[in-house]
Amino acid sequence: MLSLENKTFTWSKDKNRDNIKNHRLSFREAAPVFLDPYLVVLHDQAHSTMEETRWKGIGVLHNDLLLSIIFSEEKEDVIRLISAREATKKEKEDYRENINRIFGTQ
């Protein structure tokens, strides 16, 4: 568990271990992506269920690494991290397009 900017982040120890093994990134390291003021958040309809709505966030960490992070909200201020990895080329393009829309640039 980690608290950051009035949010609490939780995760499964097993999922975190798998994420470190598969993506070389812990959830504790990935959580600050939520501080990115331009974080793109999309509904992850393919993996959502009636019991759990999942979201995909694309944002920059403090070290300029662009991440894709899957999460759900357990309560208003509790975010459960499910997966985190470096963004794909397409996700990076989506993020840049969002920045361009915000600032009106090409």
Language-model-detected regions and their locations in the chain:
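Ribonuclease/tRNase effector modules and their secretory precursors
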Residues: 1-106
